[in-house]
Protein backbone atom coordinates (compact mmCIF):
# COMPACT_ATOMS: atom_id res chain seq x y z
CA UNK A 1 0.00 0.00 0.00
CA UNK A 2 1.38 3.38 -1.02
CA UNK A 3 -1.21 5.65 0.55
CA UNK A 4 1.14 6.89 3.31
CA UNK A 5 3.51 8.35 0.72
CA UNK A 6 0.82 10.82 -0.29
CA UNK A 7 -0.43 11.51 3.23
CA UNK A 8 -1.06 15.22 3.63
CA UNK A 9 0.92 17.01 6.31
CA UNK A 10 -1.07 18.52 9.17
CA UNK A 11 1.50 21.26 9.56
CA UNK A 12 0.45 24.81 8.84
CA UNK A 13 2.53 27.35 7.04
CA UNK A 14 3.68 30.25 9.19
CA UNK A 15 1.55 32.69 7.20
CA UNK A 16 -1.54 30.61 7.92
CA UNK A 17 -0.79 30.57 11.64
CA UNK A 18 -0.15 34.31 11.76
CA UNK A 19 -3.30 35.04 9.76
CA UNK A 20 -5.43 32.88 12.07
CA UNK A 21 -4.05 34.82 15.04
CA UNK A 22 -3.72 38.22 13.34
CA UNK A 23 -5.48 40.07 16.16
CA UNK A 24 -2.97 38.67 18.68
CA UNK A 25 0.35 39.09 16.84
CA UNK A 26 2.99 41.56 18.02
CA UNK A 27 5.95 41.76 15.62
CA UNK A 28 9.42 42.83 16.76
CA UNK A 29 12.15 43.39 14.16
CA UNK A 30 15.69 43.35 15.54
CA UNK A 31 18.84 44.81 14.01
CA UNK A 32 21.09 43.04 16.53
CA UNK A 33 20.67 40.44 19.29
CA UNK A 34 18.98 41.65 22.49
CA UNK A 35 19.25 39.79 25.81
CA UNK A 36 16.31 38.97 28.10
CA UNK A 37 13.52 39.12 25.53
CA UNK A 38 10.28 37.61 26.89
CA UNK A 39 12.11 37.19 30.22
CA UNK A 40 9.48 37.11 32.98
CA UNK A 41 12.16 37.93 35.60
CA UNK A 42 13.46 40.97 33.69
CA UNK A 43 17.05 39.77 34.11
CA UNK A 44 16.42 38.77 37.74
CA UNK A 45 15.29 42.31 38.51
CA UNK A 46 15.60 41.71 42.28
CA UNK A 47 19.38 41.58 41.90
CA UNK A 48 19.90 43.87 38.91
CA UNK A 49 19.02 47.40 37.88
CA UNK A 50 17.10 46.27 34.82
CA UNK A 51 14.27 48.55 33.73
CA UNK A 52 11.33 46.65 32.17
CA UNK A 53 10.11 49.88 30.57
CA UNK A 54 13.27 50.15 28.46
CA UNK A 55 12.31 50.50 24.82
CA UNK A 56 13.63 47.78 22.53
CA UNK A 57 12.29 49.26 19.30
CA UNK A 58 9.32 51.26 18.02
CA UNK A 59 7.64 51.72 21.43
CA UNK A 60 7.95 48.02 22.28
CA UNK A 61 9.47 47.54 25.74
CA UNK A 62 10.56 44.40 27.61
CA UNK A 63 7.38 44.67 29.66
CA UNK A 64 5.28 44.97 26.49
CA UNK A 65 6.45 41.52 25.39
CA UNK A 66 5.85 39.86 28.77
CA UNK A 67 2.39 41.38 29.21
CA UNK A 68 1.43 40.44 25.65
CA UNK A 69 2.34 36.81 26.39
CA UNK A 70 0.47 36.88 29.70
CA UNK A 71 -2.60 37.91 27.72
CA UNK A 72 -2.24 34.90 25.43
CA UNK A 73 -0.71 36.82 22.55
CA UNK A 74 1.77 35.84 19.86
CA UNK A 75 5.20 37.51 19.79
CA UNK A 76 6.85 37.24 16.37
CA UNK A 77 10.55 38.13 16.44
CA UNK A 78 12.45 38.74 13.22
CA UNK A 79 16.18 38.68 13.91
CA UNK A 80 18.64 37.02 16.28
CA UNK A 81 17.79 36.96 19.98
CA UNK A 82 20.29 37.17 22.84
CA UNK A 83 20.78 35.34 26.12
CA UNK A 84 18.12 34.28 28.67
CA UNK A 85 15.34 34.37 26.07
CA UNK A 86 11.99 33.31 27.60
CA UNK A 87 13.48 33.00 31.10
CA UNK A 88 10.82 31.86 33.63
CA UNK A 89 8.17 32.23 30.94
CA UNK A 90 4.81 31.24 32.37
CA UNK A 91 5.67 31.84 36.03
CA UNK A 92 3.47 34.15 38.11
CA UNK A 93 6.46 35.41 40.08
CA UNK A 94 6.09 36.15 43.79
CA UNK A 95 8.44 39.12 43.46
CA UNK A 96 5.69 40.85 41.49
CA UNK A 97 3.06 39.80 44.07
CA UNK A 98 2.17 36.69 42.09
CA UNK A 99 1.36 33.17 43.28
CA UNK A 100 4.64 31.53 42.23
CA UNK A 101 2.56 29.09 40.20
CA UNK A 102 2.23 28.38 36.48
CA UNK A 103 0.07 30.67 34.39
CA UNK A 104 -1.01 29.99 30.83
CA UNK A 105 0.78 32.24 28.37
CA UNK A 106 1.00 32.70 24.62
CA UNK A 107 3.41 31.83 21.85
CA UNK A 108 6.77 33.12 20.63
CA UNK A 109 8.05 32.67 17.07
CA UNK A 110 11.64 33.43 16.10
CA UNK A 111 13.15 33.90 12.66
CA UNK A 112 16.75 34.07 13.84
CA UNK A 113 19.47 32.47 15.94
CA UNK A 114 19.02 32.01 19.70
CA UNK A 115 21.83 32.56 22.21
CA UNK A 116 22.51 30.63 25.43
CA UNK A 117 20.13 29.89 28.30
CA UNK A 118 16.95 29.98 26.24
CA UNK A 119 14.02 28.93 28.44
CA UNK A 120 15.72 28.75 31.83
CA UNK A 121 13.08 27.87 34.42
CA UNK A 122 10.39 28.08 31.72
CA UNK A 123 7.06 26.78 32.98
CA UNK A 124 4.51 27.24 30.17
CA UNK A 125 3.98 28.58 26.68
CA UNK A 126 5.24 27.53 23.26
CA UNK A 127 8.29 28.69 21.32
CA UNK A 128 8.80 28.11 17.60
CA UNK A 129 12.27 28.63 16.12
CA UNK A 130 13.05 28.62 12.42
CA UNK A 131 14.72 25.29 11.66
CA UNK A 132 17.33 27.08 9.53
CA UNK A 133 18.64 28.90 12.59
CA UNK A 134 20.93 27.84 15.43
CA UNK A 135 20.34 27.53 19.17
CA UNK A 136 23.38 27.81 21.44
CA UNK A 137 23.84 25.58 24.47
CA UNK A 138 23.27 25.42 27.32
CA UNK A 139 19.54 25.65 26.80
CA UNK A 140 17.07 25.87 29.65
CA UNK A 141 14.14 23.83 30.95
CA UNK A 142 12.84 23.18 27.43
CA UNK A 143 12.37 20.16 25.22
CA UNK A 144 11.55 19.79 21.55
CA UNK A 145 8.25 18.24 20.48
CA UNK A 146 6.71 17.53 17.09
CA UNK A 147 5.98 20.85 15.40
CA UNK A 148 2.69 21.89 13.84
CA UNK A 149 4.20 24.78 11.85
CA UNK A 150 6.11 23.91 8.70
CA UNK A 151 9.80 24.83 8.81
CA UNK A 152 9.84 25.59 12.56
CA UNK A 153 11.03 23.61 15.57
CA UNK A 154 8.67 23.60 18.56
CA UNK A 155 9.82 23.86 22.18
CA UNK A 156 7.88 23.65 25.43
CA UNK A 157 8.71 23.51 29.14
CA UNK A 158 10.05 20.17 30.39
CA UNK A 159 8.10 20.64 33.62
CA UNK A 160 4.86 21.42 31.83
CA UNK A 161 5.36 18.45 29.51
CA UNK A 162 5.67 15.87 32.31
CA UNK A 163 2.86 17.43 34.34
CA UNK A 164 0.23 17.85 31.62
CA UNK A 165 1.27 18.49 28.02
CA UNK A 166 2.41 14.91 27.43
CA UNK A 167 -1.30 14.31 26.73
CA UNK A 168 -1.24 16.50 23.62
CA UNK A 169 2.39 16.77 22.47
CA UNK A 170 4.62 14.16 20.85
CA UNK A 171 8.26 13.93 21.91
CA UNK A 172 10.99 13.63 19.33
CA UNK A 173 13.40 10.70 19.44
CA UNK A 174 15.71 9.81 21.12
CA UNK A 175 13.77 11.25 24.09
CA UNK A 176 11.07 9.03 25.62
CA UNK A 177 8.13 9.36 27.99
CA UNK A 178 6.41 6.54 29.85
CA UNK A 179 2.87 7.81 30.50
CA UNK A 180 2.02 4.99 32.90
CA UNK A 181 5.05 5.53 35.12
CA UNK A 182 5.34 9.28 34.57
CA UNK A 183 9.02 9.02 33.59
CA UNK A 184 10.64 11.31 31.03
CA UNK A 185 13.97 10.09 29.66
CA UNK A 186 16.11 12.77 27.98
CA UNK A 187 18.70 11.21 25.70
CA UNK A 188 19.46 14.02 23.25
CA UNK A 189 22.79 15.04 24.91
CA UNK A 190 21.81 18.72 24.81
CA UNK A 191 23.29 20.51 27.82
CA UNK A 192 20.62 22.30 29.85
CA UNK A 193 20.19 24.56 32.88
CA UNK A 194 17.29 24.37 35.37
CA UNK A 195 16.04 20.91 34.37
CA UNK A 196 12.81 20.19 36.26
CA UNK A 197 12.41 23.76 37.53
CA UNK A 198 9.35 24.13 39.80
CA UNK A 199 8.25 20.51 39.32
CA UNK A 200 5.19 20.04 41.51
CA UNK A 201 3.96 16.52 40.75
CA UNK A 202 5.31 13.04 41.45
CA UNK A 203 6.90 12.66 38.02
CA UNK A 204 10.47 11.62 37.22
CA UNK A 205 12.87 13.30 34.80
CA UNK A 206 15.96 11.28 33.85
CA UNK A 207 18.80 12.97 31.97
CA UNK A 208 21.33 10.65 30.37
CA UNK A 209 24.20 13.09 30.01
CA UNK A 210 25.64 16.17 31.70
CA UNK A 211 23.61 19.19 32.81
CA UNK A 212 24.65 22.71 33.73
CA UNK A 213 23.23 25.20 36.25
CA UNK A 214 20.46 24.94 38.85
CA UNK A 215 19.10 21.45 38.24
CA UNK A 216 15.80 21.02 40.11
CA UNK A 217 15.58 24.66 41.17
CA UNK A 218 12.41 25.40 43.19
CA UNK A 219 11.13 21.82 42.87
CA UNK A 220 8.45 20.78 45.35
CA UNK A 221 7.68 17.20 44.34
CA UNK A 222 8.98 14.50 42.04
CA UNK A 223 12.45 13.43 41.10
CA UNK A 224 15.23 14.54 38.76
CA UNK A 225 17.96 12.00 38.05
CA UNK A 226 21.10 12.97 36.13
CA UNK A 227 23.33 10.20 34.84
CA UNK A 228 26.27 12.53 34.38
CA UNK A 229 27.81 15.61 35.98
CA UNK A 230 25.99 18.80 37.00
CA UNK A 231 27.00 22.45 37.19
CA UNK A 232 26.68 25.03 39.95
CA UNK A 233 23.62 25.58 42.14
CA UNK A 234 22.30 22.03 41.83
CA UNK A 235 19.14 21.81 43.92
CA UNK A 236 19.15 25.54 44.60
CA UNK A 237 16.09 26.71 46.55
CA UNK A 238 14.85 23.11 46.49
CA UNK A 239 11.50 23.00 48.27
CA UNK A 240 10.78 19.27 48.16
CA UNK A 241 11.29 16.26 45.95
CA UNK A 242 14.57 14.55 45.17
CA UNK A 243 17.53 15.48 42.97
CA UNK A 244 20.00 12.67 42.22
CA UNK A 245 23.29 13.29 40.43
CA UNK A 246 25.19 10.17 39.39
CA UNK A 247 28.41 12.11 38.97
CA UNK A 248 29.94 15.28 40.42
CA UNK A 249 28.38 18.70 40.94
CA UNK A 250 30.04 22.08 40.84
CA UNK A 251 29.94 24.57 43.73
CA UNK A 252 26.92 25.84 45.71
CA UNK A 253 25.00 22.56 45.69
CA UNK A 254 21.85 22.99 47.80
CA UNK A 255 22.15 26.79 47.86
CA UNK A 256 19.26 28.22 49.91
CA UNK A 257 17.72 24.73 50.02
CA UNK A 258 14.44 24.67 51.96
CA UNK A 259 13.37 21.02 51.89
CA UNK A 260 13.79 17.79 49.96
CA UNK A 261 16.74 15.51 49.29
CA UNK A 262 19.86 15.82 47.13
CA UNK A 263 22.06 12.78 46.44
CA UNK A 264 25.44 13.24 44.74
CA UNK A 265 27.24 10.03 43.85
CA UNK A 266 30.53 11.90 43.72
CA UNK A 267 31.98 15.24 44.80
CA UNK A 268 29.38 17.93 45.55
CA UNK A 269 31.87 20.80 45.27
CA UNK A 270 32.62 23.74 47.55
CA UNK A 271 30.20 26.01 49.43
CA UNK A 272 27.93 23.01 49.92
CA UNK A 273 24.64 23.94 51.56
CA UNK A 274 25.30 27.69 51.58
CA UNK A 275 22.34 29.53 53.18
CA UNK A 276 20.56 26.18 53.50
CA UNK A 277 17.48 26.08 55.75
CA UNK A 278 16.14 22.51 55.73
CA UNK A 279 16.46 19.30 53.74
CA UNK A 280 19.21 16.69 53.46
CA UNK A 281 22.21 16.39 51.14
CA UNK A 282 24.03 13.09 50.73
CA UNK A 283 27.38 13.10 48.93
CA UNK A 284 30.57 11.07 48.80
CA UNK A 285 32.61 14.25 49.17
CA UNK A 286 32.20 18.02 49.30
CA UNK A 287 33.14 21.08 51.32
CA UNK A 288 30.25 22.45 53.32
CA UNK A 289 29.84 25.97 54.72
CA UNK A 290 27.82 27.11 57.77
CA UNK A 291 25.05 26.67 58.66
CA UNK A 292 25.41 23.27 56.98
CA UNK A 293 27.35 20.60 58.88
CA UNK A 294 28.84 17.26 57.87
CA UNK A 295 27.82 14.02 59.61
CA UNK A 296 28.45 10.30 59.38
CA UNK A 297 25.47 8.25 58.20
CA UNK A 298 23.15 6.54 60.66
CA UNK A 299 21.35 3.26 59.96
CA UNK A 300 18.32 4.99 58.46
CA UNK A 301 20.55 6.94 56.07
CA UNK A 302 22.36 3.78 55.00
CA UNK A 303 19.04 2.00 54.41
CA UNK A 304 17.69 4.94 52.41
CA UNK A 305 20.74 5.12 50.15
CA UNK A 306 20.71 1.35 49.74
CA UNK A 307 17.08 1.59 48.58
CA UNK A 308 18.35 3.85 45.78
CA UNK A 309 21.10 1.38 44.91
CA UNK A 310 24.03 3.13 46.61
CA UNK A 311 26.66 1.52 48.81
CA UNK A 312 30.05 2.63 50.05
CA UNK A 313 31.13 5.81 51.80
CA UNK A 314 28.70 8.73 51.86
CA UNK A 315 28.30 11.69 54.19
CA UNK A 316 25.17 13.51 55.27
CA UNK A 317 25.06 17.30 55.16
CA UNK A 318 22.30 19.02 57.14
Curated annotation (Swiss-Prot):
One Pfam family of this chain: GXGXG
Domain of life of the organism encoding this protein: Archaea
Record protein name field: Uncharacterized protein MJ0658
Entry's Gene Ontology molecular function annotations: oxidoreductase activity
Family classification: To M.thermoautotrophicum MTH238.
Amino acid sequence: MLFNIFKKSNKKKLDEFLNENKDKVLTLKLDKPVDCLCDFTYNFIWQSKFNPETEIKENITFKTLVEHLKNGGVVYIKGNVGKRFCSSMGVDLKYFSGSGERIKVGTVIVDGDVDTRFGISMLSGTVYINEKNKIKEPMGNVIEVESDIKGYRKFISITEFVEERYKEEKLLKPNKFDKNKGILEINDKIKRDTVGARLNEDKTIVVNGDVDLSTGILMRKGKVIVNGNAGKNTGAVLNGGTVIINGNTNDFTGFEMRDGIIVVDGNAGKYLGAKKKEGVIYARDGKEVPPTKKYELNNDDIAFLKSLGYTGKFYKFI
